[in-house]
Amino acid sequence: MRRAVFLTLLGLVPGILSAQAAPSAPPVFTRADTLRGSNTPERAWWDATFYDLHVKVNPADSTISGYNAITYRVSKKAREMQIDLQLPLVVDSIVQDGSALSTRRDGNAFFVRLLAPQTIGAKKKMSVYYHGKPVVAVRPPWDGGFVWAVDSLTRPWIVTANEGTGASVWWPNKDIYSDEPDSQRVAITIPDSSIEVSNGRLRSTTHNSNGTTTYEWFVVNPINNYDVAVNAGHYTHYSDVYEGEKGKLTLDFWPLDYHVDTARKQFAQVKPMLQCFESWFGPFPWYEDGYKLIETPHLGMEHQSAVAYGNHYKNGYLGRDRSGTGHGLLWDFIIVHESAHEWFGNSITMKDAADMWIHESFATYAEGLFTECTQGKKAGAEYTIGQRKLIRNDVPIIGSYGVNHEGSGDMYDKGANMLHTIRQLVDDDARWRGILRGLGKTFWHQTVTTKQIEGYISTQSGLDLSKIFDEYLRTTKVPTLEYKLQGQQLSYRWTNVVPGFAMPVRITTSPERLSWIRPTESWKTATVKLDRPEDFHVDENFYVDVKDLLKPVTDSTTVRKG
């Protein structure tokens, strides 16, 4: 879930159908954006293999202190390394092989001068010690950082949420999406009065003599930096087991102590969700680390194996249905959407923020698939189609590369409708399911590019989808099917499309008669069997606009048919 889509997710963008929003001014990027978003030379030569993170959280003064011991593999010789840690946090020292290293700071990036030779293929270790007051999240999870909250009994409730802001907002690391450690330890020390829950499995709990407790969690799989999370509060715990495609998956639930009975009822949706998503996407990606659902004071976040939940135990999105169909009120949005990210976002991860659609389009599409699993195929389609009213077509879905810049919030609903449209083109649900499961298998625990995902879907479908991806991901256009129906003669063409766009589309010429037409940018004419002109429709499962050119001018507005 991303900060840029706050209004869209709430469904507060009224009356937007096919109209395009006013063009936004082009973004202006800085050196800081490049240092954050690109694989700089000081990053490119080393591969993070293990993070050993130890952090003490001090709620009395909202400070943290600790260190991250970074194990990395050398891929080329270098003398300088980039480590990211955001202001106002302070690096105390950086140590390798017992020697303190000199650094220079450039905003949120530290450039470490190395003393020891960096031999290609060797594994090395470096420890970064730091402290300070981390950025406080203004509007978590969208504008992220540390959250110093209290529960309804005014007890401390401390969590992190930092996908867009970056993990370096509270701990030092190589803060780029394309490099994940193979595993990670997360050891968090907090006052004894609270319980702390992080990613992976709990390995030890140490009660210290100074009134604090250290919780040591361990993740045995690759993990995104931004997925690493602190959750400290007055939690209670209960567990269950899901019999899944890879055997027994442990389910651990961490609601606040006074919400446990409510949680047991609401969290019963987890097993049907897992069953649905395993059937469509393949096995849950983290059997070794388990599945956790943790109550948080913010709305929610896809923290790997530790999904943050703050939907107030309501169905829908804070009790509302984003699709406007009613179907979304029959399940909990946060459980479904954020858990879908375990497949698309956590197991399959973008290399660059510009390709965020890989996370959000698929997770939003998963909402429709869950609706299909529980309410039927028609309801699933209606849910996805209902989300079109939230599409703005303001800027392209794909952002700018190398500067930590995601594109339009349309990556959610427009991206989901693009995938729903492609499903129609595949026109074979078994094959479509195979494509989705194949994505999960082929790119299991990998970072990827848009081109890889586009290429895989095109290859496995046997269709050249390049122009379709270009249209929906790289422009703000919606394909418009212009047509003229004169008796049994249908003339048609595509407009408002990228050059070479020739997507087939399904039409109905009677309530029971479906057929395909193959428009291009040039006019085509076909004879159709039509009993009544009003029986002609373009299948609404296609996200396109439709324009009848023979209607009177006053009625000739663009009408959303797909």
Whereabouts are the PLM-identified features?
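Glycine/proline-rich low-complexity spacer/linker segments in large multi-domain proteins
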Residues: 32, 36, 40, 120, ...
